[in-house]
Every structure is written in structure tokens, then in C-alpha cells.
């Protein structure tokens, strides 16, 4: 292996640069059930952020995992919203964004990936690369996000280690460098060999133990398990050294290579190695693109963008939190910031750090940190906050829905309340709401049916609004625009029964099917139909 040390930093950095350099903001991506939420728990456990890790679908008195905090998440054992958790380890500040693994929540996940500098890809050792993992990896590749791989569940029956690495290299076109190597698999899994420093760490116990793992020399493995062929382990290591590329920090940071760790998140094994690897190799906050220029993290003036809105995190208070990724500078409690979309200033009087649904006041935060900003509808997804500069961060999109439904309210007297609730849910990004210009009932658009279940459950639990969903005459939605305002107005007038407004008041063409959409598009000269909408600079 080549040198694995992170790049050395200049000794003359400013205090701001020192703080920024301590940050590691990352997401965890995986296919559902690969162990992502369990790994999240154990990273927090190793980071000293919690005392007892929960278990997904836990029994008896074991509590639900910290990251899966919403009622529907606790009931189904899945993540449906992005949780943000901050903890410290080895004098570094980690901002962990736990994303939904289910494909129905891909939009929330995509936006989350705009807010991170690196990602951990969790792979089930028995299943290898799965469809959802591949899709999320492609998003990371588009955004040049470096990937660290954790192959999980090594203590269960699993595929051949070389097969797993070969699949990563061929399926994802990504070089692999094992940083640890499994000794045995399934019931015979004894632990991992530290490829960089030598020595075998043994799998011991389980539960909430995070003490130092026992480490022995590879020559002593035979004494622990007489059935183990130590020479076979040595042969595997020699073959891995020949077959896999040596670790190069630049190749990793550029997204060409992934360091690979093996373990069992459920049994707390391999998690410490992964966390140390994140601290050593994952980049500090990177420069962010705006419509005017690239913004460097160590610039003195604060800037940030909103990538998520979450309402009613505390059911006892109708609160609304905007999650903002700091892109540069330092945020101080009480400072004023310019909301670029409106051109108005707002006071950041009580910014907050989060730990799933728990929160604490953020007196100060630095580039790379994720803070919650309480507000009453002022902030929206994609908004940019600055200390005066008129720039807008780009790349926080909305996607056209794949399912469109009408909302039927069982109690017509609550129509106004439903309108307000849907507005709030759409601003959160839970669903998209389209209001037909001909006065017909509102339509909701989602990526998959599970989103409808979440919407129904939240409307009932948070607003006491029992609803049903009905098939709509429309199945597709496309944002429409034109360089010629008169042409756009004429198109809207001619197709009024199929025009709706989104949450921002932008016009959307609702189509019955693909054929009708294509037919209309061919005849709409000068009109652009888009299935993706990026943030706007001005309202």
C-alpha cells in the first residue's frame, strides 16, 4: 500500500480555516435493508454521541433507532426523511446525513447529496451491488462525491470477497483498495486483517460495547481456530495486493477509487475502522458552485443554501425548520443574512444543531456544518443565504412526479385546513402540490406509492385530516417556460384545463399520458417542457 495519510495542511491557517478543516460532512447511501440505519447508529455510538444503540425493528424494551424518529418510520423500520446528526471523534466534527433508502424518497436523497462532501456506500455482503445502490452511486458520481465503501453483514453467509470487489469495479467502474480484509465469512468470520498497519482484529461480543477490539498477529490465528488455514488467508492477502490498486488520496478524492472496509454494523465490528478512515481520507468542506462563481469554504463571509424543510418535528409545537448547509465563513447566532430570492434580510436568532429530532442552540457554525433555521414559511428548498452578496447556489432541483393523484377530504368543512397542510407538505418536499387554474381540486405528485402513505399518515397524525387518494385524469407533469412571454401566455390560455401552478406559482402542464404530452409538445413552438426544475434567483 502507498501512503494513506491525508494531505498535510499549511501551518499558517486562520482560525476560520482551522475550524473548516475539522469538518467532515457525509451521507450514507445503500439499498434498503443493507444495514444503513444500523451503521448510522453505530457510528454515533463510536463517536460517543449516544450511550445505547437502538436496533431497526427492535423487540421488547429496545428503543427505536435515533435516526428513524418519525412515527411511520418507527412502525415500518425504514427511513423516509433525512436525519441530520452532528458528533465529534478524534477532534473532528462529523455531520452525518442519514438518507432514505427507499426509492420512493429519491428526491429527498438527491437534495441531501447536494449538501455533503463525501459518502459511505453500504453493501450487503450476501447481495452485493443492488439497484438502489447503483442509482445513488451515479448521483454521487455526477456531483464528484468521493465514496468510502463498507461491506456489511460479514458475520452472515456472504459472497466471495473477490467477487464483491470485482462487482464494484465492473458495475460502478470504480477501482477498489481494501483497507481491511475479512478473515473467514459467515459463521467462520473471525475478524479483519488491517492491510495498512498489519495485525488481525478479532470479532468479539456484541451489544453496545465499543471498547478496543482485541488484536493479534496473523501467525496466531491458527491457535484461535484450528480449522482455519492461515496459509490460505496469507494467499488471499497476497492476491488482493496484486489485484487491487494501492490507495491514492487524489484518486479517491476525484472519485476514481474507493477504500473498502469490511465488518458487521450490528455487532459493532469494523465501524471504528470506517470512522477513522472517514476522518483521515474524506475531504474537508469543498468549494460550491453558484450562478456567479465558485465559493470557497474558507472565505470569511457566511453563505449557505437550504436543501430541506421539515415541519412539525415537535408535534406539540407547529414548528418549521429549514436545514441549511453552510458553504463558507462562519454563522453566529443573532446575525442577519440576506435571503437572495427575495432580496430581504432575516435575523438568524436561533440556529440549531440536530441529532435526529433532538436539537441544541448553535451559537456558532462553520462551513460544512448543517444547521436548522426556525422560520414561518420564509425559507424554501433551494434558497441561498449570504452576508450581502447577490449569488445563488445551483444544483438543488425538483423532479417531475411519476404518480399524480387527487386528494379527497372526508370532512369537507376542513378544506381550508387541508390547503394549508398541503402547502406546508409541498414546501417540505414531502410531495409536490399542483393547483389547477380551472379551480379543480388540488393534485399531489409523488415518485412512488410509499410517499402517499407517508402523506396520508402525516396529515392524519399532525393535522387530524383523514384523506383518501383518487386516480386523476392526469398522469404526467412538466414545467413549462419560454423565452417569449407572449408565447407562454398564449399556450397557457389555449390549454387552460391542463395548466396548474406549483408551490412557487410556476406554470405546469398536466398531461393525460405520454402520447398526449408528445402531441402537445410537437405543436407548442417556443415552449420548453422540463421534467426538472432548478432553483430560481428571484421570486
What residue spans do the PLM features occupy?
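Structural and coupling elements of P-loop NTPases
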Residues: 1-539
